[in-house]
Amino acid sequence: AIARSTLAQWVGECGVQLQPLVDALAAEMLSYRVLHADETPVAMLKPAGQRDGKTHRAYLWSYCTTGFNPMRAVVFDFADSRGGQHVRAFLGLPGTEHKPGWKGKLVSDDFSGYKACFELGVTEAGCMAHARRKFHKLWANHGSTVGEQALKFFIQLYEIEREAKDLAADERKAIRQDKTQPIADA
């Protein structure tokens, strides 16, 4: 069997070799007006010299285009923390080494690390799946009638999205304004 440390080293070396491809893909993604972002914790063995047999929490940030773009892609960006500076650096926002910075719509959860992006010209677009999850948890754990009613609204919203998924952007927008807005206002 090949030692896990050897496999990890090989993966790291491959990552270094593939970095120009990842950079080109990220640059192409930043030409689109809408991106999705999320982050998830991963265990990371402490660097050489700091090893005491323990791991610490690092994060794998993911950025993807929407299903409506001609190029469907995901870029994963490993970071040693969950700090918002990582998403700002990926988007090339002021205060990072990249400029002038991306100015599209970012679909994300309500994690505070994204908030500085919205103060720097990025438009916040909340993720319906993350919002729905909170209401589902409220309903499932506490029998909340508010949570139950919200879930019924989400069923309606998802049905409208299914109807509109194959339409052109302007047609999707019109349907959303016509059918979704009244539900959101209810």
Which residue ranges define each predicted feature?
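Catalytic center-proximal scaffold of phosphoryl-transfer enzymes
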Residues: 1-186
